[in-house]
């Protein structure tokens, strides 16, 4: 509504494309998150909080790993994919789509945290604060539009509130005694930063390498996924976690 008020209906086409990408990527990861949520619920109900701390870190890695397998190629080849999909790509669609993928990153990372809060049953205060944080997106975007008159700030505001919500979720789960924040930072976040430091130059290189065919894009995508798996094995996951993840995925596909 705010985008429409400031920039007209034409900007809504780019926003609609970004929303479709958001839905597709998040639903892909969420289909796996639904499979592991009972483990978190059961572990909390049994008051095995030390195990729960490990599960939160493990399932966070699992979720982010799946997200990156989809999001990194999509982020890298957004322009080419949109051109094939739409032919006539709306203004800002490329930028909106990439910024949306960043929003999804923090939401995927947050999922094991809010699932744990739900398992506790103490969600009233949590829901009020989270709702307040997320709704801040609207006034922040409005003020940015008034100052700079650039539609991109709608997504900058989304990213900002997604980060705030993630920080609050970490704090909330820590208060429940279900998360060692120091171990969460060192065991997950710092490893994730290391992974991104390696992956970002690959994305940057492909930004300046023009893709001329679908087959070339597919070949590059498989190369990126292969490199991502290798890098994740050494930087994000330990050997036991790597084995557990692929056993977990194989069980899910057998059920499907």
Predicted regions and their residues:
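Alpha-helical transmembrane segments and their helix-entry boundary regions
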Residues: 12, 125-127, 153-155, 184-187
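Membrane-interface helix-loop junctions in multi-pass transport and translocation proteins
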Residues: 124, 131-167, 174-175, 179, ...
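Interfacial/gating helices of multi-pass transporter permease domains
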Residues: 2-23, 91-95
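Membrane-proximal transmembrane or re-entrant/amphipathic helices at the cytosolic face
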Residues: 174-181, 202-256
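Membrane-interface junctions at transmembrane-helix termini in multi-pass inner-membrane proteins
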Residues: 101-132, 148, 177
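Alpha-helical transmembrane segments of multi-pass membrane transport and lipid-handling proteins
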Residues: 29, 53-108, 135-146, 201
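Short alpha-helical transmembrane segments in multi-pass integral membrane proteins
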Residues: 55, 60-75, 88, 130-134, ...
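Helix-loop junctions and terminal segments of transmembrane helices
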Residues: 18, 22-60, 114-119
């Amino acid at each position: 509504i705010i985008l429409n008020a400031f920039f007209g209906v034409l900007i809504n086409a780019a926003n609609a494309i970004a929303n479709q990408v958001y839905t597709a990527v998040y639903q892909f990861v969420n289909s796996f998150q639904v499979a592991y949520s009972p483990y978190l619920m059961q572990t909390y109900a049994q008051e095995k909080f030390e195990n729960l701390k490990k599960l939160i870190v493990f399932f966070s890695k699992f979720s982010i790993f799946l997200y990156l397998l989809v999001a990194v190629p999509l982020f890298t080849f957004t322009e080419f994919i949109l051109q094939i999909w739409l032919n006539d790509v709306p203004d800002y669609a490329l930028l909106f789509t990439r910024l949306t993928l960043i929003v999804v990153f923090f939401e995927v990372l947050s999922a094991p945290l809010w699932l744990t809060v739900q398992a506790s049953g103490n969600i009233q205060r949590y829901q009020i604060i989270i709702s307040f944080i997320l709704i801040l997106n609207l006034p922040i975007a409005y003020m940015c539009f008034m100052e700079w008159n650039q539609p991109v700030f709608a997504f900058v505001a989304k990213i900002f509130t997604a980060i705030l919500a993630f920080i609050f979720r970490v704090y909330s789960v820590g208060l429940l005694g279900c998360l060692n924040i120091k171990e969460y930072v060192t065991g997950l976040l710092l490893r994730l930063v290391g992974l991104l430091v390696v992956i970002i130059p690959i994305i940057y290189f492909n930004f300046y390498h023009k893709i001329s065919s679908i087959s070339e894009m597919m070949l590059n995508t498989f190369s990126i996924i292969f490199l991502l798996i290798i890098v994740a094995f050494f930087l994000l996951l330990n050997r036991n976690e790597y084995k557990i993840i692929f056993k977990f995925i194989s069980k899910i596909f057998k059920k499907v």
